[in-house]
């Protein structure tokens, strides 16, 4: 693709008009139009500004790639995952999970994953299926996987959740809250210390990070991706060790460590 085609593609991906892009760049929309038609090329200063506005590297604008890989927003159908979780929950008599599935679907109704048309419920269902695929079928863990974002993102309270106290406690630990007067780093330190004190919560958080790492390339800005990488490097070795030191989760720890660290390493090489 030419520079002009790259500019147009990046602009359209961010749902900007030429006028909106021009305003952010400090140029006329005619200038943006001429770049996209390849009549003129932006100078170096404008290329740098374009990269900032689109939150990409300069090379993403100037590189001419004749072939682009087709990518997927999802791998599995969320309704199929729901059926799998429900069927498994019935077979293992997982009462909390059966209640949590429908509650989570209703709570997240209408929500989408960042910068996509993927229903948000895909994310908690992914965590539940990931755990079940590793032969983790503890009722409270699967239920908490499904409900882990409803307090933080849906305005629900712990008391409203249709599950037992242990599941509510896992959801509480998974819910990130910045207390009044607390800076983000202090809040994160307190949050991860709480997770590390509970092996089940540590396991769920590692499942959560696995899914978020695999989707952040299209859901987050480069700045947020960098923050996600540094946060993972800082806090997840301890969580993974907690999971590994819990005999019933030892095998799962190997898989989680491999997925988290290999995915982070790929991003580091490409950033």
Where are the model-predicted features located?
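Active-site helical microenvironments for divalent-metal-assisted chemistry
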Residues: 70-271
């Amino acid at each position: 693709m030419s520079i002009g085609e790259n500019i147009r593609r990046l602009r359209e991906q961010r749902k900007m008009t030429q006028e909106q892009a021009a305003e952010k760049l400090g140029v006329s929309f005619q200038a943006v139009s001429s770049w996209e038609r390849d009549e003129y090329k932006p100078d170096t200063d404008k290329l740098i500004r374009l990269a900032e506005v689109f939150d990409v590297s300069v090379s993403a604008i100037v590189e001419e790639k004749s072939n682009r890989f087709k990518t997927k927003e999802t791998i599995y159908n969320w309704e199929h995952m729901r059926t799998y979780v429900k069927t498994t929950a019935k077979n293992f008599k997982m009462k909390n999970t059966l209640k949590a599935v429908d509650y989570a679907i209703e709570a997240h109704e209408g929500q989408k994953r960042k910068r996509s048309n993927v229903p948000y419920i895909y994310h908690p269902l992914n965590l539940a299926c990931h755990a079940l695929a590793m032969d983790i079928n503890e009722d409270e863990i699967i239920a908490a996987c499904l409900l882990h974002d409803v307090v933080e993102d849906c305005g629900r309270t712990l008391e409203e959740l249709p599950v037992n106290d242990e599941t509510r406690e896992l959801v509480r630990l998974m819910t990130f809250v910045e207390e009044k007067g607390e800076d983000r780093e202090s809040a994160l330190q307190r949050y991860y210390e709480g997770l590390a004190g509970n092996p089940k919560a540590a396991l769920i958080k590692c499942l959560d990070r696995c899914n978020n790492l695999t989707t952040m390339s299209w859901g987050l800005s480069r700045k947020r991706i960098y923050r996600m990488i540094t946060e993972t490097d800082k806090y997840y070795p301890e969580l993974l060790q907690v999971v590994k030191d819990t005999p019933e989760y030892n095998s799962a720890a190997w898989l989680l460590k491999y997925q988290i660290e290999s995915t982070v390493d790929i991003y580091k090489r490409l950033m």
